[in-house]
Swiss-Prot record:
The active site is at D371. NCBIfam families: PRK02946.1 (NF002804). It catalyses: L-seryl-[isocitrate dehydrogenase] + ATP = O-phospho-L-seryl-[isocitrate dehydrogenase] + ADP + H(+). Keywords: ATP-binding, Cytoplasm, Glyoxylate bypass, Hydrolase, Kinase, Nucleotide-binding, Protein phosphatase, Serine/threonine-protein kinase, Transferase, Tricarboxylic acid cycle. This is Isocitrate dehydrogenase kinase/phosphatase. Bifunctional enzyme which can phosphorylate or dephosphorylate isocitrate dehydrogenase (IDH) on a specific serine residue. This is a regulatory mechanism which enables bacteria to bypass the Krebs cycle via the glyoxylate shunt in response to the source of carbon. When bacteria are grown on glucose, IDH is fully active and unphosphorylated, but when grown on acetate or ethanol, the activity of IDH declines drastically concomitant with its phosphorylation. The gene is aceK. One of its GO terms (biological process) is glyoxylate cycle. The lineage of its organism: Bacteria, Pseudomonadati, Pseudomonadota, Gammaproteobacteria, Enterobacterales. It is found in: Cytoplasm. Its main location: cytoplasm.
């Protein structure tokens, strides 16, 4: 290869990333217009399009590089020089951290995820000590109650870029002050002030004002979800001021925010104070930089390995029929491998399972489906694998592992947030905790269905409980769109003997689902059955599911709230006009 080509390749990769992030910002910048026009289907399409941008631009760069090198193979020294040139381009580059991840992606695409070493890739950042020397403009604006909180909030809401009229701004301000007074106390409120991000965070059918509430005792989140009525008038739906509430809003089971962030690292640092429980990976994920979040997630995993002497073990819970799941006892993630052979009742292919996981990545997860990161050629040190797990790997996934002596390479796996399996949780709790868990499970089913997702296998073992007590679905091999399912009532038995027969007396076609049958396995436990019948009996009726299908087919997009219904101002303080119920 001629000298000088290394720099050209490095520049080509960085220019490719520039193009990708430019398009990322372009799609993001349309969020305000989509919100103002209530174009909810465009919101969903933009979310999918933005996710696809990254891989699309990686592919474009790879094709460019193949043209530049004329398809000739490149030796290791040549690639090291390319990385050296690329590293020299980054010190003055505003998005250096994501540019490093983009370089990694291009390399992996070129070399089919082989030879993934720190020398060739940015496994760790080339500039870990660097922070933001200059920010072109402030990320946030401060508001002080010099003339009282009513004036402060009036200025804050009037300062928003939204061009729609308010339904009743004075009312919303009264509600916010009432909440803050209840939370902080009347004496403390005058000594507090707010810092608000310049950019709104858009997701689903809401525009979130995200801020920091500085009190005499510390800093709290200050989150206002702003909605629009069918008539195009704005209203504030609630005010959230605890770290737990903020953590749920920015949770791993939710779709990525659309927030205009030309300097994503600066925004991540700004968010860290009000989301202290979130890792760097989770913060990048929340603002839509999911590929760099994968890089950060892998770095967090490597750091954990260096600080721990734990061994990988099979994950607790009922063993899956499609996925082999393992973990580290103290790590908050699980590793999931698609088995070489599935249980006989699972009539599907590995390609189908991967397609289901991709569907979840692109779909609105409504706070009820865990996000995943996908890895290829994942290396594990044999010394860190428990012998029982090693035997299980050789038994269940021999075609997906390569033995390199001291290490094994797993051809493909997913990493996902670790949760307590719901079936285990239900065995351990009672009283109000049991009631809350059953309510959460039913709500998860309803919200998934309203978002056009049918879980397929709704057994408790396929759901997990987060640290905030939320129930989240994580077994995706049987999911499908609601509109693909035929919900049927079980026909009346022709004869008494029919109900005792081992085979049904009625025909069953692919895609047929009989909600009445859910009762047999959801209500078998006498502790659970009465609670389920009380709160979610309509889930056993086919007409409930068919009514949801009708709404979906008619184009309705349901509201998705990242907080309890009882927290809405309309429930707490008074009735917001019924026109606020969007269709």
């Amino acid at each position: 290869m001629p000298r000088g080509l290394e720099l050209l390749i490095a520049q080509t990769i960085l220019q490719g990333f520039d193009a990708q992030y430019g398009r990322f910002l372009e799609v993001t910048s349309g969020a305000q217009q989509r919100f103002e026009q209530a174009d909810w289907h465009a919101v969903q399409q933009a979310m999918k399009s933005r996710i696809h941008l990254y891989d699309h631009h990686v592919g474009l760069v790879v094709e460019q590089l193949r043209c530049i090198t004329d398809g000739k193979s490149t030796d290791a020294d040549f690639l090291l020089r390319v990385k050296e040139h690329y590293t020299r381009l980054l010190p003055d580059y505003p998005r250096f951290e994501i540019a490093e991840s983009f370089f990694n992606s291009v390399y992996c695409r070129l070399f089919d995820h082989r030879s993934l070493t720190p020398e060739r890739l940015f496994i760790f950042s080339s500039q870990p000590e660097r922070r933001f020397r200059t920010i072109p403009r402030p990320l946030a604006k401060d508001f002080f109650p010099d003339h009282g909180w009513e004036t402060l909030l009036m200025r804050m809401l009037s300062d928003l870029p939204l061009r729609l009229p308010w339904q009743n701004k004075s009312r919303d301000i009264r509600y916010i002050i009432a909440h803050l007074t209840e939370t902080l106390g009347e004496d403390a409120l005058p000594r507090c002030h707010v810092q608000v991000a310049n950019e709104l965070f858009y997701r689903n059918k809401a525009a979130w004002l995200v801020g920091k509430l500085t009190t005499p005792d510390g800093t709290l989140p200050f989150l206002l979800p702003i909605h629009r009525t069918d008539e195009g008038e704005l209203f504030v739906d609630t005010c959230l001021t605890t770290t737990a509430e903020a953590s749920i809003v920015f949770g791993f089971a939710r779709s990525y925010f659309m927030v205009y962030a030309p300097l994503p690292a600066a925004l991540v640092e700004w968010l860290r104070e009000i989301l202290p429980g979130k890792t760097t990976a989770e913060l990048y994920m929340a603002i839509g930089c999911q590929k760099h979040a994968k890089t950060e997630s892998y770095r967090e995993y490597l750091c954990y390995l260096t600080e721990s002497d734990e061994k990988f073990i099979e994950a607790p819970g009922i063993r899956g029929m499609v996925m082999l799941v393992f973990t580290l006892p103290g790590f908050d993630r699980v590793f999931k491998i698609i088995k070489d052979k599935f249980a006989p009742q699972k009539e599907m292919s590995a390609a189908h399972v991967r397609a289901c996981y991709q569907l979840v990545k692109e779909h609105d997860r409504v706070g009820r489906m865990a996000d995943t990161q996908e890895f290829e050629n994942f290396v594990l040190d044999k010394r860190q694998i428990d012998p029982a797990l090693m035997a299980l790997l050789r038994q269940e996934v021999p075609e997906k592992i390569t033995d390199l002596g001291e290490h094994i390479v797993i051809r493909h796996l997913y990493i996902e947030r670790r949760m307590v399996p719901l079936n285990i949780w239900l065995e351990q709790v009672e009283g109000q905790q049991l009631r809350d868990a059953i309510e959460e499970y039913g709500n998860a089913i309803r919200q998934l269905a309203a978002a056009n997702i049918f879980p397929g296998d709704m057994l408790f073992k396929n759901f997990g409980v987060t640290r905030h007590g939320r129930v989240v679905f994580y077994d995706y091999d049987e999911i499908c769109y609601m509109t693909e399912v035929n919900f049927r009532d079980i026909p009346p038995a022709r004869y008494p003997e029919d109900e005792l027969a081992s085979e049904p007396w009625y025909s069953v076609s692919p895609g047929d689902v009989f909600p009445e049958e859910f009762r047999h396995w959801l209500c078998a436990d006498p502790r659970i059955g009465p609670l389920f019948e009380e709160m979610h009996a309509d889930l056993f009726r086919a007409d409930y599911w068919r009514a949801l299908q009708t709404r979906i087919k008619e184009g309705h997009v349901e509201d998705v709230y990242a907080y309890r219904r009882r927290q809405r101002f309309s429930v707490r303080y008074g009735a917001i006009s019924s026109t606020a119920n969007s269709s």
